[in-house]
């Protein structure tokens, strides 16, 4: 084991090496495996055909989330309602069969703890600092917010982890993204990560494991950190780590699957030792000034297409790279925008508050604080609030947030991935715009022809009540309990 100063990433990597290989890769032990209905059926079937057991069912957790409807799931007598889409129904049925057959804990669609895997993992204490965690889903990097080395894998790798609890991997380069200073009170973690992605570009993190550091990162709550780490993949990075600290330990203490008693004390001591050593050298360091971050919105079809809400649509000719110019022209055509057009005031027909990026209780509180005493604008046809899990939903209802949203004209839904992606009934109609708290604004991501503008929960709420993309700083402040 090297005694040279090491980064957080290097410490976790080194602790999980089973075997070093001549080509520089290594066989890495995987501590945790999250499974959902979309990328697991083929892997389970391959195990079944080969007569292999799942190596560590106790380190595996299965949760349906992508295809589940967010409307009622059972009828008045408690019977499951049928899933309309045949492919979705098949995938959900497969997970319901496969997980119990292979001894995996299965949180069903009707379980009060069901939700999006990247919300359920942390809140259950399944995600822990210093662990390696994988899922057949690109936004697995979210768990890095708790100091885990977490990343998405493909279906063939899902099978490999199920069978061996290992993966052959090549070590990533390390990148420090240091956010210096304090964020403005009107700036959210979503604004911060959109700003970072714009600064790095969607390929800027390719080949790197990002570690987020600096005063602004330390000041974030755990749920805000989860938002930042979640979108590391949109910057091209394999994962996005934040060193565990006292906030992390307080968040995890007492969680159902977190260590207990003496095991907890032992775990915390080890977690503390994982912080990047003084003198450790990153392959690259990027410095972000917190004061430069403003409430932001995407204008195009790439997560790097970000401007402040006070900004305008850029002219494709302003990009130096011809490929970027061409991409910008295609984006503007798809999005129905013109160079120089102001983002503020752009009408939206749909608003989505949810996804593994922004569906936790703090996100819903932020949105509700904007919605309170106001009503969804007449031109907004669809305004959904989709909690990230059953636990989040019940907490929000205990705080009365559901009533705030419903009184304002929002639909209050059951947990799931929902309108983040067009794999369930929640979609944006072709040609319509959506102010969305999700993580991707790709062509067709929210439905064929859908036009997505990525924003924070507070910005999405502001768009809903005004009917257009709005600088929330211009809204008359209203305290919960008062009238607008």
From Swiss-Prot:
Instruction: Check the UniProt entry and state the signal peptide residues, or none.
Output: none
Sorted alphabetically, which keywords does the UniProt record give? Answer: 4Fe-4S, Amino-acid biosynthesis, Branched-chain amino acid biosynthesis, Iron, Iron-sulfur, Leucine biosynthesis, Lyase, Metal-binding
| NCBIfam families xrefs | leuC, PRK05478.1, PRK12466.1
Record the organism: Zymomonas mobilis subsp. mobilis (strain ATCC 31821 / ZM4 / CP4)
User: Which biological processes are named by the entry's GO terms?
Assistant: L-leucine biosynthetic process
Q: Quote the protein name from its UniProt record.
A: 3-isopropylmalate dehydratase large subunit
The catalytic activity of this protein is classed by the Enzyme Commission as 4.2.1.33
Q: How is the cofactor bound?
A: Binds 1 [4Fe-4S] cluster per subunit.
Give me the gene this protein comes from. Answer: leuC
UniProt KW Methyltransferase keyword: no
């Amino acid at each position: 084991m090297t005694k040279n100063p090491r980064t957080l990433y290097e410490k976790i990597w080194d602790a999980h090496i089973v075997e070093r290989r001549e080509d520089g890769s290594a066989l890495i032990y995987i501590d945790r495996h999250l499974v959902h209905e979309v990328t697991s059926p083929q892997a389970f079937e391959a195990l079944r055909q080969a007569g292999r057991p799942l190596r560590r069912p106790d380190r595996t957790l299965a949760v349906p989330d992508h295809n589940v409807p967010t409307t009622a799931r059972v009828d008045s007598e408690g019977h499951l309602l049928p899933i309309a889409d045949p492919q979705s129904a098949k995938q959900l049925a497969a997970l319901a069969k496969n997980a119990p057959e292979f001894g995996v804990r299965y949180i069903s669609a009707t379980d009060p703890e069901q939700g999006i895997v990247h919300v359920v993992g942390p809140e259950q204490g399944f995600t822990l600092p210093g662990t390696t965690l994988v899922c057949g889903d690109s936004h697995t990097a979210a768990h890095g917010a708790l100091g885990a080395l977490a990343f998405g894998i493909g279906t063939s790798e899902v099978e490999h982890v199920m069978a061996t609890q290992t993966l052959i991997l090549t070590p990533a380069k390390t990148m420090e993204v240091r956010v210096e200073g304090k964020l403005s009170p009107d700036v959210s973690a979503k604004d911060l990560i959109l700003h970072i992605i714009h600064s790095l570009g969607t390929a800027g993190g390719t080949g790197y494991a990002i570690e987020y550091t600096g005063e602004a990162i330390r000041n974030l709550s755990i749920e805000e950190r989860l938002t930042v780490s979640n979108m590391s993949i949109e910057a091209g990075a394999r994962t996005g780590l934040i060193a565990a600290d006292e906030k992390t330990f307080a968040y995890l203490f007492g969680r159902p699957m977190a260590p207990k008693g003496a095991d907890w004390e032992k775990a915390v001591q080890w977690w503390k030792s994982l912080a990047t050593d003084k003198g450790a050298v990153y392959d690259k360091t990027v410095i972000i000034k917190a004061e430069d971050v403003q409430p932001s919105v995407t204008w195009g079809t790439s997560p790097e297409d970000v401007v402040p809400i006070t900004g305008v649509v850029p002219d494709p000719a302003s990009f130096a790279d011809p490929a970027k110019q061409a991409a910008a022209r295609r984006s503007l055509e798809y999005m129905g925008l013109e160079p120089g057009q102001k983002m503020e005031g752009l009408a939206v027909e749909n608003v989505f508050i949810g996804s593994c990026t922004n569906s936790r209780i703090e996100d819903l509180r932020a949105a509700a604080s904007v919605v309170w005493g106001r009503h969804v604008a007449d031109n907004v046809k669809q305004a959904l609030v989709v909690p990230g899990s059953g636990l989040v939903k019940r907490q929000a209802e205990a705080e009365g947030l559901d009533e705030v949203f419903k009184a304002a004209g929002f639909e209050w839904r059951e947990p799931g991935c929902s309108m983040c992606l067009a794999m369930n009934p929640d979609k944006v109609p072709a040609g319509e715009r959506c102010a969305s708290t999700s993580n991707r604004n790709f062509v067709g991501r929210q439905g064929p022809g859908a036009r997505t503008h990525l924003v924070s929960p507070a910005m999405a709420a502001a768009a809903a009540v005004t009917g257009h993309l709005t600088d929330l700083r211009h809204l008359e402040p209203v305290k919960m309990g008062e009238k607008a």
